[in-house]
Curated annotation (Swiss-Prot):
Cited InterPro entries: SAP_dom, SAP_dom_sf, SIZ1/2_SP-RING, Zinc_finger_PHD-type_CS, Znf_FYVE_PHD, Znf_MIZ, Znf_PHD, Znf_PHD-finger
Gene label: SIZ1
Superkingdom of origin organism: Eukaryota
Zinc finger SP-RING-type: from-to: 349-430
Domain SAP: 12-46
UniProt xrefs under CDD domains: PHD_Bye1p_SIZ1_like, SP-RING_Siz-like
Name of the protein in question: E3 SUMO-protein ligase SIZ1
Entries under SMART domains matching the protein: PHD (SM00249), SAP (SM00513)
A single Gene Ontology CC term: nucleus
Biased composition annotated in UniProt, kind: Polar residues: 808-819
Location of the region described as Disordered in the Swiss-Prot/TrEMBL record: 796-820
Source organism of this protein record: Oryza sativa subsp. japonica (Rice)
Length: 875
């Protein structure tokens, strides 16, 4: 018997308080008191009954001494499994109770079976749940820790479960638990009364502080803290006190919350744990908590150590240890809608990227300054970030570990550094604070937006921060070194430059190097030594990107409407930028045989949606022969017309191109809106009128161009045997009697419009302005003759002469044959014929002044097709 008592005494001296309490719990004895008191209670069972009466136990324990010894031996064997040192290595002295086993730093209350519940029972049953913390992993009773929201319902098992101590450590990472004098105590709800009010409740507990614990909490970085937590809180990691909570520690009242007692804690609110270091003392301490709340809480007392901001920041994983750069880049691509090309090739997502890049603000949502270290919570699906240091500093006081972008609650262990945006912010550290935006493409490439300290940051970078390869600007090769084309915006009128100069003799000639094929100006005539092959190759540029050719198009749409074009006659490639909309019908030379058009020589231009519209064939041609006096340039049309002719003034210095100034430099003229031509070497043109029934007739004009510089006459075929002679008409005069034929023509101010400077003489013109526009006969196709005008400009002295007889051309309407276009000056002079839409009784619209040479508006259904007949020169 003595050996049994001696063996049990040695084992009891080795036990911790928890093992002693566990033994006393199995024996049915009280578990309060110091460790020596607990040992004495167990040893008393191994002695006589006098010891039991001495300790004041009123009932005799039914267990025998052998049963008590067996319980002690089983407990000792369990501790041996946990690597307890062998008793043989220790002194067998019965009075050796000074040995104190090393307790675990995280939680001293951790049984060998790792079963710890707030109900203080270590029994294992069928309904258990384990903590997910790798350092804890304790098992708890499911019914004790999972509380349903409504009574009678079953509690929902969370996907990730943490015990109350692990939740406490994550609620405020600036406090780390160093000990638990009072383990979690469940504050069970007492229900409500019949009138629906909660029943006041209070619980009183005692905890013991040893001398070492007391000395620890007296240190500056340690404190004794009381905490409380709602078991089924929606915000898992926070403290929360019940309503009307009142706390007393050793009889001293302690305030727990600053909000009113009746106010519930909101979803974004946080409660703090009061510090009771000044209220505690060494030894036994009593704590009492009362409340009026039907919810289930648990509270406890812990020894906590403060952490600094730097220490908390060190808990955040480094950039290399956190998320990989590939995952961060994939998230950015997903958020911008670009995604990975290989993975999302078959994606049918509704998100479409419209902009080439997205502007991302690098300002921290908390501080408003540019982020230094880009931080984020790992579970967040957005790409927004915040400044890591600022976020941690703010949470030292607020204890709200919540994403400022999506407002979801997390813990410190979910905080990380974003590797994608952190590379960008690290490159911007030397920039000014106003540089806080970057443009990010869907593939992850980026550039700094704004004035950066370095020009390299304003260039596009790869996602990893390296510079993108600069794209080389590929300029189209010119067909000829003398041919240049300069593009401009649609903000204003540009100019048309022709490379000609006046020689010392007063004769205009091409201002370039000598060339066998370049045309020369001799005796007021344009001649070409090679049969005028200078205009063989014509490069055409469209005037209307929308192909509508309307005078009311938005200039922002017609980006190609205004260009600088250099027309050089010293090479074989010349640019006709959208010739006049109403330049005649066709061209013909009598010295060439007439040929029928081939299918390949016809180009049909139409913006109609209908595919089977009837084509308008070219009915008439321009006869490229001279008149009786050898100086005519007859134009043949069908309809009522007028012939006006003016002879130039053969003064000194006014040659065939006397309209120009005496400056020896290249002259410059404004570029009017021209109709689009097409790149064919042939010279046949057919344009359409206002009437949908126009088939083989061309709309007549009431006037023609008297081309004074080269002594040309514009002859009109009026459909009768003789030409009609009329008085000279006014030049582009704005009149209400015109009925909209020329809508507020600004050319009425002769000499003011720069577009006509190329046709004005060098001296003041004496052309009388007359007007006779009333009672005119309609053309056979229904278009009134007042719908056609001509700009008659000439040098002084010839304006009052009688017009020469018209060269009437009554030949049948035949297709155009091969011909060569006359020199550029002749063609440019004839390209000003303007067709204006007939609008009976319409008022003049001043808003269309700037579009005097534009094509008239027509509905799509009445706009006929254009048949462009071009004959190829076989030579």
């Amino acid at each position: 018997m003595a050996d049994l008592v001696s063996s049990c005494k040695d084992k009891l001296a080795y036990f911790r308080i928890k093992e002693l309490k566990d033994i006393l719990n199995q024996l049915g004895l009280p578990k309060q008191g110091k460790k020596q008191d607990l040992i004495d209670r167990v040893l008393a069972l191994l002695t006589d009954e006098q010891g039991q009466r001495h300790h004041g136990w009123g009932r005799k324990n039914s267990l025998t001494k052998e049963a008590v010894a067996k319980i002690v031996d089983d407990t000792y064997r369990k501790m041996q499994i946990q690597c307890a040192p062998d008793l043989a290595t220790r002194s067998h002295s019965g009075s050796d109770f000074s040995f104190r086993p090393i307790e675990e730093a995280y939680d001293s209350f951790q049984p060998e079976a790792k079963v710890r519940c707030i109900c203080s029972s270590t029994m294992v049953n069928d309904s258990m749940i384990q903590c997910e913390d790798q350092r804890c992993q304790v098992w708890q009773h499911l019914n004790c820790v999972l509380i349903p929201d409504k009574p009678g319902e079953s509690a929902e098992v969370p996907p990730v479960f943490y015990c109350e101590l692990c939740r406490l450590s994550r609620a405020d990472p600036f406090w780390v638990t160093a000990g638990n004098p009072l383990l979690p105590v469940k504050f069970v709800s007492s229900g409500v009364t019949n009138d629906g009010t909660s029943v006041p409740q209070s619980v009183e507990k005692s905890f013991q502080l040893s001398r070492s614990d007391r000395e620890t909490v007296q240190r500056q970085e340690y404190d004794l803290q009381v905490w409380c937590m709602l078991l089924n809180d929606k915000v898992q990691f926070r403290m929360q006190w019940p309503q009307y909570a009142e706390l007393h520690v050793n009889g001293i009242s302690v305030r727990v919350v600053t909000r009113p007692g009746s106010q519930l804690l909101g979803i974004n609110g946080r409660d703090d744990g009061p510090l009771i270091t000044t209220c505690s003392r060494e030894g036994i301490n009593k704590i009492c908590l009362s409340r009026v709340d039907a919810r289930t809480f648990c509270f406890g007392v812990r020894i906590a150590k403060r952490r600094t901001v730097a220490q908390v920041l060190n808990l955040v994983p480094k950039e290399a240890e956190g998320e990989s750069f590939e995952h961060a880049l994939a998230r950015v691509r997903r958020c911008l809608g670009g995604g990975d090309t290989a993975e999302n090739a078959d994606s049918d997502s509704d998100l479409e990227v419209v902009a080439e890049s997205v502007t991302v603000n690098l300002r921290c949502p908390n501080s408003g300054s540019r982020m230094r270290i880009a931080g984020r919570f790992k579970p967040c699906i957005h790409m927004g970030c915040f400044d890591l240091e600022t976020f941690v500093e703010l949470n030292q006081r607020s204890r709200k570990w919540q994403c400022p972008i999506c407002l979801k609650n997390y813990s410190l262990e979910s905080l990380m550094i974003d590797p994608y945006f952190n590379r960008i912010t690290s490159l911007l550290r030397n920039c000014n604070e106003d540089v806080n935006e970057v443009d990010v493409k869907p593939d992850g490439s980026w550039r700094v937006k704004g004035d950066a300290a370095s020009r390299e940051l304003s260039q596009w970078h790869m996602p990893d921060g390296t510079l993108c390869n600069p794209k080389e600007d590929v300029k189209p090769a010119m067909q000829n070194g003398n041919e240049q084309m300069m593009e401009g915006t649609s903000d204003g009128q540009k100019s048309l430059k022709i490379g000609i100069k006046r020689n010392p003799n007063g004769i205009w000639e091409v201002s370039s190097k000598a060339d066998d094929k370049k045309p020369s100006v001799v005796g007021n005539r344009m001649q070409n030594n090679s049969g005028f092959r200078a205009l063989n190759n014509i490069m055409h540029m469209s005037n209307s990107p929308t192909s509508s050719y309307r005078d009311g198009e938005d200039p922002s749409v017609n980006q190609e409407s205004n260009r600088h074009v250099d027309l050089s006659l010293n090479n074989g490639n010349n640019e006709f930028d959208s010739f006049s909309l109403n330049f005649g019908q066709a061209c013909n030379t009598d010295d060439r045989p007439q040929q029928q058009h081939n299918a390949t020589d016809v180009i049909v231009l139409s913006d109609s949606d209908e595919e089977n519209d009837a084509m308008v064939c070219p009915p008439a041609v321009y006869d490229n022969t001279t008149t009786a006096n050898g100086s005519g340039f007859p134009f043949t049309t069908n309809g009522i017309g007028y012939t006006e002719r003016y002879q130039e003034d053969a003064g000194v210095g006014t040659s065939g191109l006397g309209l120009l100034s005496n400056n020896v430099d290249d002259f410059e003229m404004n570029n009017w809106q021209m109709h689009s031509s097409y790149q064919q070497p042939e010279q046949g043109f057919q344009f359409f009128g206002n009437d949908t029934d126009v088939h083989n007739t061309f709309v007549g004009s009431h006037n023609s161009f008297g081309l004074a510089p080269n002594d040309y006459s514009l002859d009109c075929n009026v459909g009768v045997e003789e030409a009609s002679v009329t008085p000279a008409l006014s030049v582009c005069r704005n009149s209400n009697e015109m009925h909209g034929s020329l809508v507020d023509n600004p050319l009425a101010l002769v000499g003011d419009d720069p577009s006509l400077q190329i046709f004005l003489p060098s001296q003041p013109s004496s052309v009388p302005l007359q007007e006779e526009l009333s009672e005119r006969a309609n053309a056979p196709n229904g278009v009134q003759s007042d719908d056609w005008i001509s700009l008659t400009l000439a040098a002084g002295g010839g304006g009052n002469e009688e017009p020469a007889p018209a060269d009437v051309n009554s030949q049948p309407q035949i297709p155009s044959t091969e011909t060569g276009i006359e020199p550029l000056t002749d063609a440019a002079s004839a390209f000003l014929s303007t067709n204006i839409e007939r609008r009976s009784g319409a008022d003049l619209n001043p808003r269309r002044i700037e579009n005097i040479f534009s094509h008239p508006r027509q509905p799509r259904s009445v706009r006929p097709r254009l048949c462009l007949s071009i004959d190829t020169d076989s030579e």
